[in-house]
Amino acid sequence: MEHAVLGAGAIGGLVGTAVASLGESVTLLVRSERLPGYPANVSVERPSGAITAAAKVAVTLANPVDVLWIATKTYQLKMALQAVHSLPRCIVPLLNGVDHVEVLRAHFGHDRVLPATVAVEAERIAPGRFVQRSPFVNLNLAASGEQVLGGIVARLRDLEFTCKFIQNEQTLLWSKALLQHRRLHYGDLDCCDSRKGH
């Protein structure tokens, strides 16, 4: 399958590297100023051991891909979408909040967007170099994407990702939003989703 990652910071870089390490074709979409000198191999340092993989890098997505993973910050989404010049088979957003799903469905079409959430503490320490700080990566996806993503999700479990397909999209999205609100409100120090280095 052909994959692209829009927002190759901490979260996007981690996911993109993991997918590429499984032998999938991955293109990281980066800002033009970061393109020169971007490494041909990307890596993630993890508590369970580092992974390294080859990945392509581009400023825009000109050709269709099977999966477009989106991991921009929410306020950057609309501007970032200007880099996507083709229509992916499916779009998997890993943003915080819930409003981005309707934005993406208006842009790409309802059925192409497969809501998802990710919980991990990660950091981009240099172009193409990422660190997973937490011992876990929890990836939950809408059950509507199981036919397309079931194979890749099963292989991500081999990399110690905890992955689930959730039947109810609202439950999927709001459960994380409420968890983040509780942690912010009560000062819980556990970091569920750290997006440093975008």
Which residues does each predicted region cover?
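Residues at the C-termini of beta-strands that transition into short coil/loop
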Residues: 30-32, 59-61, 95, 117, ...
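Hydrophobic Val/Ile/Leu positions in short beta-strands of Rossmann-like dinucleotide-binding domains
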Residues: 5, 69-70, 141
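Short, charged/polar "capping" segments at the starts of alpha-helices
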Residues: 34-39, 100-102, 147-149
